[in-house]
């Protein structure tokens, strides 16, 4: 497994269950998206990426390296097959089927972070102050109102705030907005601090790390993985 947030979190829970764990990473575990993302824990983000309108946006974004939907252009049958399936999934029916599952995963993820912090074994920044989704125009307000209705239907607490209420909540961050929706469920952390302290905690618990090591394959016995092959043996 790699040394990003997924790899280290997996190592954390495996060692808690009594397993001997070795984390293999091709770098030095000092960079990448796990260290520099926004750190949001967002139960409010219940709408799947495959949603109505994403096909048109996707075509505009997929060739832009700075977009959230960038893909390196290439002729790849698996990528083309995935793209066709993605297009077929961009329907209102798919959105409605997916939201409950996405919410449950997001809430469970937030719960695990809270449990990590409350255990006292891992010191990291975590605030549960919610998330403001601000808007400037009536059109943007109506678009977000649709998501708000879905979120409330799934049990999330969402409040609509005018500019004065937003300013009272964020007095040191003046905003050129008409208002905002506040999702009470959301939280945020500081990824760089979390990753650093999680790495230290894993070392203290006996997890081994093989850095600057690339996984090149696997050895199998009876169709099961018996060993990992790396560029160092």
What are the residue ranges of the model-derived segments?
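Glycine-rich Rossmann-fold phosphate-binding loop(s) that bind the pyrophosphate
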Residues: 2-4, 26
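N-terminal Rossmann-fold NAD(P) dinucleotide-binding loop
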Residues: 7-8
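Gly/Ala-rich phosphate-binding loop of Rossmann-like dinucleotide-binding domains
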Residues: 11, 15-16, 201-203
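Glycine-rich FAD pyrophosphate-binding loop
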Residues: 15-36
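Residue-level detector of anion-binding/catalytic polar loops
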Residues: 20, 157, 208
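Dinucleotide-binding Rossmann-like beta1-alpha1 core, especially the glycine-rich loop
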Residues: 38-162
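Helical element adjacent to the flavin cofactor pocket in flavoenzyme catalytic cores
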Residues: 142-154, 173-232
């Amino acid at each position: 497994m790699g040394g990003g947030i997924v790899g280290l979190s997996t190592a954390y829970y495996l060692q808690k269950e009594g397993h001997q764990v070795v984390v293999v990473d091709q770098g030095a575990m000092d960079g990448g998206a796990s260290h520099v993302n926004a750190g949001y824990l967002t139960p409010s983000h219940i709408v799947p990426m495959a949603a109505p309108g994403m096909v048109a946006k996707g075509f505009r974004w997929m060739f832009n390296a700075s977009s959230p939907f960038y893909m390196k252009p290439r002729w790849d049958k698996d990528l083309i097959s995935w793209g066709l399936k993605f297009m077929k999934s961009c329907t209102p029916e798919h959105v409605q089927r997916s939201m409950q599952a996405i919410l449950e995963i997001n809430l469970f993820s937030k719960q695990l972070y809270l449990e990590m912090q409350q255990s006292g074994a891992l010191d990291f920044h975590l605030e549960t102050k919610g998330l403001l989704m601000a808007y400037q125009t009536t059109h943007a307000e109506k678009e977000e109102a649709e998501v708000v209705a879905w979120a409330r239907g799934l049990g999330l607490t969402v409040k609509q705030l005018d500019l004065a209420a937003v300013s009272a909540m964020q007095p040191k961050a003046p905003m050129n907005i008409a208002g905002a929706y506040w999702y009470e469920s959301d939280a945020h952390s500081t990824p760089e601090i979390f990753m650093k302290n999680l790495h230290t905690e894993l070392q203290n618990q006996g997890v081994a790390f093989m850095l600057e090591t690339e996984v090149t394959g696997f050895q199998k016995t009876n169709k099961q993985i018996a060993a990992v092959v790396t560029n160092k043996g």
